[in-house]
């Protein structure tokens, strides 16, 4: 059933003007990510430059300045580098923590990982749940770990970093498990008793990008429905981040159509069509979006070397 509903969103016809607006919106929702063993301060700085100015030739070729992306996502050891480079830019610094990507480290080690990243300047923390505990039915344990992680996002000034809870849906085996994990994560974040964010909110996220399958439309639809039902119950907005496997502009537009038709009719439905509450975790997507924008504006495709790889 979810497969059929998700497939229906790929059949919508989008007008050219709406498509261009959608591409720019999708660009503003990208979390540029590098999570490799060979990451370095130099690579992180390149990622930051790309995040602030996705295409350095935009004004020359398009006669307009394209939006920055939403965030860069790095390991905790590179948070301070990115925080310094992005200060005042509006681009957020996100960091994976909690024993990414396995989630199998002792809880106190994972919480210390979060606190260090927040102190270093992280605006957002992408945590990963312990799938072994979840699949063994230890739901209270998983929920408590999410709650404790949310509390570890607190800053000394009374604010807190935003939290994205990665479910690693490719390891959850069934869509019923995806729904249960979504509900669990949303309620566990809410039970932390943290003050509301001034801008944006906390998220649930599909994947680490290290496991296949990563983000799929049926999985994302199930998670969006959990977000919708929580909103109808409480009035609280929770964000959504599909991550991994979204490589083309066409795919990104399909996801935005799904968000619009699933959440857009709610009283605050437009909120999910902003980077505050919807993100794409897909670095390779960025340049494909830029190529498509260039084609819509100029009638010609740019070569891959026209865009930096960060």
Task: List each language-model region with its residue ranges.
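Charged, compositionally biased N-terminal leader segments and the immediate start
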Residues: 1-30
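Alpha/beta enzyme core
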Residues: 17-25, 38-67, 77-241, 247-277, ...
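A short, histidine- and acid-enriched strand-loop-helix "catalytic/donor-clamping" loop
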Residues: 35
């Amino acid at each position: 059933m979810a497969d059929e509903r998700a497939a229906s969103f790929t059949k919508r016809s989008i007008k050219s003007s709406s498509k261009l607006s959608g591409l720019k919106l999708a660009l503003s929702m990208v979390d540029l990510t590098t999570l490799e063993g060979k990451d370095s301060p130099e690579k992180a700085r390149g990622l930051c430059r790309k995040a602030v100015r996705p295409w350095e030739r935009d004004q020359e070729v398009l006669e307009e300045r394209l939006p920055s992306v939403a965030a860069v996502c790095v390991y905790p050891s590179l948070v301070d580098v990115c925080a310094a480079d992005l200060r005042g830019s509006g681009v957020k610094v996100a960091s994976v923590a909690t024993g990414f990507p396995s989630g199998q480290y002792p809880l106190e080690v994972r919480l210390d990982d979060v606190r260090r990243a927040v102190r270093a300047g992280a605006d957002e923390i992408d945590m990963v749940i312990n799938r072994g505990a979840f699949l063994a039915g230890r739901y209270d344990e998983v929920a408590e770990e999410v709650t404790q992680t949310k509390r570890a996002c607190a800053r000394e000034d009374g604010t807190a970093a935003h939290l994205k809870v990665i479910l690693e849906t490719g390891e959850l085996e069934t869509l019923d498990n995806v729904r249960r994990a979504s509900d669990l994560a949303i309620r566990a974040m809410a039970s932390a008793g943290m003050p509301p964010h001034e801008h944006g909110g906390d998220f649930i996220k599909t994947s680490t990008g290290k496991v296949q399958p990563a983000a799929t439309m049926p999985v994302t639809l199930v998670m969006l429905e959990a977000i919708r039902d929580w909103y109808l119950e409480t009035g609280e907005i929770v964000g959504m981040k599909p991550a991994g496997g979204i490589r083309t502009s066409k795919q990104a537009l399909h996801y935005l159509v799904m968000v619009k038709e699933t959440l857009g009719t709610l009283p605050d439905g437009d909120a999910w069509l902003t980077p505050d509450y919807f993100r794409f975790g897909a670095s390779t997507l960025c340049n494909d979006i830029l190529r498509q924008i260039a084609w819509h504006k100029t009638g010609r495709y740019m070569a891959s070397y026209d865009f930096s790889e960060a």
